[in-house]
């Protein structure tokens, strides 16, 4: 059969056995990819520094998804939080990967079996003796089973009733761990950052799915609706399935990019909006202000700022800084973070504290400008020295570090001050190892950026697929040139023109 590549799927249009086979094979491919990718990531993942070299800096894609569902241990003896363990149990990262690969193999064999034994009695319509599928009934079965799975996940896995719970953290991504979550049945359950909403929404949606499934199993669709929506046509199923998938893809692209309880920053990295709004910077200053009320020593107060919090406040961790087509992990870009140098405080010769204006997300270069507490420009690194009035040399800017590796160290040399002012544009200053991975110094995006781009792109593609196949199934007769009200048998190709009133007719 000489079908063009874009028409090959028509071979399963009227072949329920082989339609089932290709879907099982698709599941085998998906599960096989997931398991294989997990094993690859585990082979290259370095769990030694969860603070400065977390999974998202290393470009891990499937490990974060396993972790958010409660997997934290490895058969290699390490824990995702940096500890060591002696008994990881079956459901470790490797255990989950292996389960996917075994499942993939079983699906592969099942797909082959169903391809060979395609002509099963179950697919045969006893009235006509031809292969057919009761699509509304199948819809009810799938809705019921997915409802059971959805309810079970929310009621048992997430709540810890029978399962580990999910990854839960504080708003600043510092204290994350896997724990049971109680359903949030109040209005707070609609807050996308409240983990309890995950449990309650799965329980509610699962209950609805179970009831809807039972309804579709026990109630047949009216004939007019059945015909109007082409419920007997498999392409209707394809069209509506694509709609469900692209809708879900758009939703998860949003929850990933803008952030939610389902996409913790400890697993996927911070969002770009946290940089844009100075989210972590505000929390750091709040902690410093609170600390100064009890202890007047800036060094001691800044030394208590968690290195993890300081690291979030660095532009290199902003997923919007890396180009979409720059391959590689964040570590391949600006390097592996080794340590926090400390917080630089700039002052002019009058002792006034100055703040470096931070680089906005979509700038590659940005002028070095230092402002005072009122936002008035007091110093800069000029483009043209001849016209400068606020240069570091003229204003006499110095820098002193508090906290971190350079705690208590100060510099007055203009070249050194300018170096740290440039680096302060990018947030908190870190020592970065670019030699180990031969990092090129060009920022990369995090898995948060890749996931969003991939799902938004495929959602758009699938949206057009839904329109295409929906139109094909709704207007199939029109596209084929057949009048839906035709009551006469016409021999196609034998007459001059289809629909010509002079054409001979033969009663059906």
Swiss-Prot record:
Membrane topology: Multi-pass membrane protein
Biological process annotations from GO: photosynthetic electron transport in photosystem II
Entry keyword Chloroplast: yes
Note describing how the cofactor binds: Binds multiple chlorophylls. PSII binds additional chlorophylls, carotenoids and specific lipids.
GO molecular function, one term: electron transporter, transferring electrons within the cyclic electron transport pathway of photosynthesis activity
Compartmental location: Plastid, Chloroplast thylakoid membrane
Chain segments annotated as transmembrane: 21-36, 101-115, 140-156, 203-218, 237-252, 457-472
Reported function: One of the components of the core complex of photosystem II (PSII). It binds chlorophyll and helps catalyze the primary light-induced photochemical processes of PSII. PSII is a light-driven water:plastoquinone oxidoreductase, using light energy to abstract electrons from H(2)O, generating O(2) and a proton gradient subsequently used for ATP formation.
Family: Belongs to the PsbB/PsbC family. PsbB subfamily.
Official protein name in the record: Photosystem II CP47 reaction center protein
Organism: Aethionema cordifolium
């Amino acid at each position: 059969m000489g079908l063009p590549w874009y028409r090959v799927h028509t071979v399963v249009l009227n072949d329920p056995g082989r339609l089932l086979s290709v879907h099982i094979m698709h599941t085998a491919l998906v599960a096989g990819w997931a398991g294989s990718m997990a094993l690859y990531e585990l082979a290259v993942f370095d769990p030694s520094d969860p603070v400065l070299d977390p999974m998202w800096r290393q470009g891990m894609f499937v490990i974060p998804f396993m972790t958010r569902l409660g997997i934290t241990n490895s058969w290699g003896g390490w824990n995702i939080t940096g500890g060591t363990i002696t008994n990881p149990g079956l459901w470790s990262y490797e255990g989950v990967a292996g389960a996917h690969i075994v499942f993939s193999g079983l699906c592969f064999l099942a797909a082959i079996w169903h391809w060979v034994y395609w002509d099963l009695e179950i697919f045969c319509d006893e009235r006509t003796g031809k292969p057919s599928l009761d699509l509304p009934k199948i819809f009810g079965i799938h809705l019921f089973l997915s409802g059971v799975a959805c309810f079970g996940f929310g009621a048992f896995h997430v709540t810890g009733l029978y399962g580990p719970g999910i990854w839960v953290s504080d708003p600043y991504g510092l204290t994350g761990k896997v724990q049971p979550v109680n359903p949030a049945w109040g209005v707070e359950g609609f807050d996308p950052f409240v983990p309890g909403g995950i449990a309650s929404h799965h329980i509610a949606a699962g209950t609805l799915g179970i009831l809807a499934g039972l309804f579709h199993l026990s109630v047949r669709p009216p004939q007019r609706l059945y015909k109007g929506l082409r419920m007997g046509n498999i392409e209707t199923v394809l069209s509506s399935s694509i709609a469900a998938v692209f809708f879900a893809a758009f939703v998860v692209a949003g929850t990933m990019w803008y952030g939610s309880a389902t996409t913790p920053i400890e697993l996927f990295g911070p969002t770009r909006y946290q940089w844009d709004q100075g989210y972590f910077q505000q929390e750091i200053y709040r902690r410093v202000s609170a600390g100064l009320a009890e202890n007047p020593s800036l060094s001691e107060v800044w030394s208590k700022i968690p290195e993890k919090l300081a690291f979030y406040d660095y532009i290199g961790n902003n997923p919007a800084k890396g180009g979409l087509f720059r391959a590689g992990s964040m570590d391949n870009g600006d390097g592996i973070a080794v340590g926090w140098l400390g917080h630089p405080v700039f002052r002019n010769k009058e002792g006034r504290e100055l703040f470096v204006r931070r680089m906005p997300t979509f700038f590659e270069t940005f002028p070095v400008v230092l402002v005072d507490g009122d936002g008035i420009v007091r110093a800069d690194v000029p483009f043209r020295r001849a016209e400068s009035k606020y240069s570091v040399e003229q204003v006499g800017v110095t820098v002193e570090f508090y906290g971190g590796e350079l705690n208590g160290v100060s510099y007055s040399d203009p070249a050194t001050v300018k170096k740290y002012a440039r680096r302060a544009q990018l947030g908190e200053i870190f020592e970065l190892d670019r030699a180990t991975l031969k990092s090129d110094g060009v920022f990369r995006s995090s898995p948060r950026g890749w996931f969003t781009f991939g799902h938004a792109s495929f959602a758009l593609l699938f949206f057009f697929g839904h329109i295409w196949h929906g139109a094909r199934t709704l207007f199939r007769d029109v596209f084929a040139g057949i009048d839906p009200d035709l009551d006469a048998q016409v021999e196609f190709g034998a007459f001059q023109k289809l629909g010509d009133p002079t054409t001979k007719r033969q009663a059906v």
